[in-house]
Amino acid sequence: MSVFSLKIDIADNKFFNGETSPLFSQSQAKLARQFHQKIAGYRPTPLCALDDLANLFGVKKILVKDESKRFGLNAFKMLGGAYAIAQLLCEKYHLDIETLSFEHLKNAIGEKMTFATTTDGNHGRGVAWAAQQLGQNAVIYMPKGSAQERVDAILNLGAECIVTDMNYDDTVRLTMQHAQQHGWEVVQDTAWEGYTKIPTWIMQGYATLADEAVEQMREMGVTPTHVLLQAGVGAMAGGVLGYLVDVYSPQNLHSIIVEPDKADCIYRSGVKGDIVNVGGDMATIMAGLACGEPNPLGWEILRNCATQFISCQDSVAALGMRVLGNPYGNDPRIISGESGAVGLGVLAAVHYHPQRQSLMEKLALNKDAVVLVISTEGDTDVKHYREVVWEGKHAVAP
């Protein structure tokens, strides 16, 4: 077997207290999922058991939630955007989301509204999709360097798309300014002072994927010991972890938060025990994770309940893409993009590492470990996906 060393910096969470949040509970997840189930075309995304890979890596189970199958959008993000927009409209028109369907909501809206957001691709596509479904307008801002394919996917949903010359976090601030000037509703997946309601709804919407996964694992007769969650601002990681620890308890779930080393604001915050922002270009292939300022709502859950934080190089994500796209033994093939594959990439990088055994012990990975991984996206940038998987871009160096 080849041996090579990729950068995987692991920090234990010294500020863990196991305090869960009622905002991201099982009951809130059930409410969100009930809404999503009423959207035409809803079905749970697959939970794929990679049994042969698990055997190779020395664990009991590797379970990958494949979000490339979500509503034909190739990513999970619409779960948050659609749910938040629906909650916003229900509040505005005094409607009850528990009894309302997406179609009924569309018919109840008496005016044209414009929803604005900043995105690296998937969240904006989800907001654009929801706005289109409801007959509304969307204006989507993207940071510099955004892939044209991700821009086109948003334009194809009838939204306006503006690529700035700023990084993600500065683009968020620009979006806020323009929204205030034009009277648009901002649907952003990060929070700040005076802006928490919509990001809370978005995070609650993300929990649908976790509720599905728990149901699927119960049908398989397995209970997860580990979960790897990738983080940008930490909205998905916080919303999903909040739900999972409500189901299994923080003490019984070894949760690992993974980020690119060029945008590792959650990792640095985890080391300090308080929010740390990261600036600059944040140049990483993991475009969906290239965020330098943690969502305070997500950060609180991660600080309280995450077991460990990981900061890793881009080659870890690229390795994950290749392993998932070229399955071992009889395992199913999973098309996973840069931000989607980094969790599995960590497992693969540990397997090939010269200090494999000590890393396995550090992460409490052993023959009894049942590991849940979320592949949050498919090949949302096909050109770059092929450069990585076909052409060997960001290769490992033995």
Swiss-Prot record:
What does the free-text pH dependence field read? Optimum pH is 8.0.
Q: Which cofactor does it need?
A: pyridoxal 5'-phosphate
Record-linked Gene3D superfamilies:
3.40.50.1100
Q: Which Pfam families match?
A: PALP
Q: Does the keyword Disulfide bond apply?
A: yes
Q: Where is the active site?
A: 77, 120
Q: Does the keyword Lyase apply?
A: yes
The protein's GO terms of the molecular function aspect are:
diaminopropionate ammonia-lyase activity; protein homodimerization activity; pyridoxal phosphate binding
- Paired cysteines (S-S): 265-291
Please give the family membership noted in the entry.
Belongs to the diaminopropionate ammonia-lyase family.
What the protein does comes down to: Catalyzes the alpha,beta-elimination reaction of both L- and D-alpha,beta-diaminopropionate (DAP) to form pyruvate and ammonia. In vitro the D-isomer of serine is degraded to pyruvate, though very poorly; other amino acids (L-serine, D- and L-threonine, D- and L-beta-Cl-alanine) are not substrates. In vivo allows poor growth on L-DAP or a DL-DAP mixture but not on D-DAP alone, this may be due to a poor promoter. DL-DAP is toxic in the absence of this enzyme, it may inhibit enzymes involved in the synthesis of pyruvate and aspartate, as well as amino acids derived from them.
Protein name in the entry:
Diaminopropionate ammonia-lyase
